[in-house]
Swiss-Prot record:
Residue numbers covered by motif 'HIGH' region: 133-143
HAMAP family found in the cross-reference section: Arg_tRNA_synth (MF_00123)
Organism: Dehalococcoides mccartyi (strain ATCC BAA-2100 / JCM 16839 / KCTC 5957 / BAV1)
PANTHER family the record matches: ARGININE--TRNA LIGASE, CYTOPLASMIC, ARGINYL-TRNA SYNTHETASE
Organism phylogeny: Bacteria, Bacillati, Chloroflexota, Dehalococcoidia, Dehalococcoidales
Compartment(s) of residence: Cytoplasm
SMART domains: Arg_tRNA_synt_N, DALR_1
Stated name of the protein: Arginine--tRNA ligase
NCBIfam families according to UniProt: argS
Amino acid sequence: MNSILAIKNIVIESLSQAMEKARQEGQIPALSVDISIEHPQKTNYGDYATSLPLRLAKATGKRPMELAQILASYIETGSGISKVSVAPPGFINFTFSKEWLCSLVKTILTEAGSYGNINMGGGSRVQIEFVSANPTGPIHIGHGRGAVLGSTLSNILKAAGYYVEEEFYINDAGSQIDAFKRTLFARYQQALGKDAAVPQDGYHGQYMVDLAAEMVTKYGDKYLQMPADIAQNDLGEIGMARMLCLISDDLKALKVDFDIWFSERSLYSGGQYKTAMDILSGNNYIAERDNATWFSSTLLGDSKDNVIVRSDGTPTYFASDIAYHYNKFIERKFDRVINIWGADHQGHVSRMKAMVSALGINPERLTTLLFQMITLKRGGELVRLSKRTGEIISLREVIEEVGADACRFFFLARSTESQMDFDLELAKKESAENPVYYVQYAHARICSILHLAEEKQLDYSTGDTALLGEEAELELIRKMAELPEIVETVSRTLEPHHLTYYAQELANAFHQFYKDCRVISDNAELTCARLKLVDASRIVLARTLHLMGMTSPESM
């Protein structure tokens, strides 16, 4: 009975049973309703509350307060609940027992690094595809936000009992790759003193000049000694591989790694594109008109049909999407697929659902998360260009300036659908104003207390947590209790910003406890009990930081 989710289920079940008893007693009619509970903003209203009486008042013909009192009269305390009360205008409140709260400290110390894990997923296979930037240039902070969203959701879903694979889809086919190769070959020739023009549709950033210089340093004029078309292709392949290495390095600096780097080309060379097209054709979702091949997505409720193969015979991006999702769902047998895309892909979502359905797959198994972009600021001023290059600021530059932990926290700090400002100056402040510093300082403060206890040779292993009873102590335990619930919420909603809010609330609860309660004192028994609480706080805060992909510093 040591999980808050178990307590939550007991509360919901007790409300359901109270409704049934009230019905049997003729006090309310038979009703079907979803029962929901939440944490009140103020703990003097209890630890859980429900507005069920307010929702049932009209159907029962009773005033909400009267209905609340009727239902509460059928609910017994126990199983971690010490008090059931009613409050205007019609709430039923539930309060955790002190005994349950104190016992939770022992549970946390026992579970240690696995505290917060739940078995929501039951081993279900989930694939999360994110970043998937074109290998034609450096990644920027928009890619960084998507990267942190993806890796954090992966951490959370693993903690919730899912099997998760993280994947980067390499867009190594199509016109952008051809433009990249033509650009690099032109820059390579220029670096060797030859007259060559960068194509108008090419890549004009300084990074291409630098990449060409790197090729000259490594290969000299080797690629001038062969036919131009072969040289352009071969050099372009090397350049693209190098760009992918740079992208990978930047992501690793952000503490983002992938299980799979999946090549778009392999969909064609491996026959998956043809197989997927055969399925769509067999299901009558392929049409030929205007010398092009179309996916009849309007048959599935989309606003328009979509071209799969252009009139010149080249596949569209959507053609690759079809083959890729055939590969994900049918060949690799993922139970659920999550795509994390920038908000500029909004128009693609409905056709993706239609395509998956046309392949014979339940479209509910595909989730596309769209995230808004980031506005970079320094104090109150917009940061548009890099001071170093005069071009759009890269993700690497931001990481180098403020650190990976600050990047990850701020990228997570708002819901995906919210645009966000990232203040570089705030991210570097060593004060409570900076939420990253505030949260990590709480962990460092915890570690300093435990180090002091070690220096004093205090053995708190036999400490009795039943001695804990100060309001600040119990508030801290209440907040620690919520971690499994946060894992469940984020796994269900796919909204990892809840983690940043929770981390700040947990840090605040610890700082308040530290202010109100002297940990190491002349009272040996109370000292041991509080040291146990401090150690449990360390575990929960470190676990929260880990789920966000951040470090837990022992000193600051």
